[in-house]
């Protein structure tokens, strides 16, 4: 398997504004599930970050298929933890290459990427300046145990069936982010969900936030945002998603003490 740090990351920056001296803030995006490839595309919204000195990076980790079908297979079922390890490896590589520094990286992911964010903040909290968990699939074990949820049975092929298979139960309990929250300090977190989300039900981000609030030992900001009119894909309408991005970017910028 190619090392993710050498084969699977895209980095965006404004060359005339950023030196590779480790001082730049970074926003690192990850997904890593279902064989979905996150193509490097142009986004006008990212310019707001780049103009403020950020480096924006995409981690093409296992669970996706950027490097082929096997890359996907190596990030599902019993190989799922490869996805989390790859993401942390990519971050460490970008630090080693002096695009940024440990503790100066904000991270963002949605849905299965939100699960990744939960795992990453537990595995390597010292790396992150802030964490944005969008509609996060953080309570993997309990969701896969509830076959009344409409999407649970079709998802067993991706995560395993803990109802019928003790091996799958033990696997999900070992890595499910919700099950692994411990008493310690965590970076600032923005946790969002949609009340009408049929894929990641609103109580997953709510349970995550409640357990974090009762467990963590720091005073860092922990914000939960539930959109009462949204489903899995957040705000709709012409400007709804722009509003969401604006709020998420403000949270990220303030975590880096950038106020303009």
Per-region residue spans from a language model:
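Conserved HGGG/HGGXW glycine-rich cap/lid loop of the alpha/beta-hydrolase fold
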Residues: 36-38
């Amino acid at each position: 398997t190619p090392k993710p740090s050498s084969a699977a990351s895209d980095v965006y920056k404004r060359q005339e504004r950023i030196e590779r001296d480790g001082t730049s803030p970074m926003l690192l995006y990850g997904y890593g599930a279902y064989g979905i490839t996150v193509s490097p595309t142009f986004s006008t919204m990212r310019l707001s970050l780049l103009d403020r000195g950020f480096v924006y990076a995409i981690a093409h980790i296992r669970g996706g298929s950027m490097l082929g079908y096997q890359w996907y297979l190596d990030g599902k079922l019993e190989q799922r933890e490869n996805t989390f390890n790859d993401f942390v490896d990519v971050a460490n590589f970008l630090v080693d290459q002096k695009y940024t520094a440990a503790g100066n990286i904000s991270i963002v992911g949605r849905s299965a990427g939100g699960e990744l964010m939960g795992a990453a903040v537990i595995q390597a909290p010292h790396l992150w300046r802030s964490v944005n968990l969008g509609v996060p699939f953080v309570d993997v074990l309990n969701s896969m145990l509830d076959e009344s949820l409409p999407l649970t049975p079709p998802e067993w092929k991706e995560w395993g069936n803990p109802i019928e298979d003790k091996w799958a139960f033990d696997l999900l309990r070992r890595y499910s982010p919700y099950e692994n929250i411990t008493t310690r300090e965590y970076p600032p977190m923005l946790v969002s969900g949609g009340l009408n989300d049929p894929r990641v039900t609103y109580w997953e981000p709510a349970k995550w936030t409640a357990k974090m609030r009762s467990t963590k030992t720091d005073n860092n900001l922990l914000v939960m945002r539930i959109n009462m009119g949204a489903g899995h894909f957040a705000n709709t309408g012409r400007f709804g998603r722009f509003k969401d991005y604006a709020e998420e970017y403000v949270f990220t910028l303030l975590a880096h003490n950038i106020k303009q």
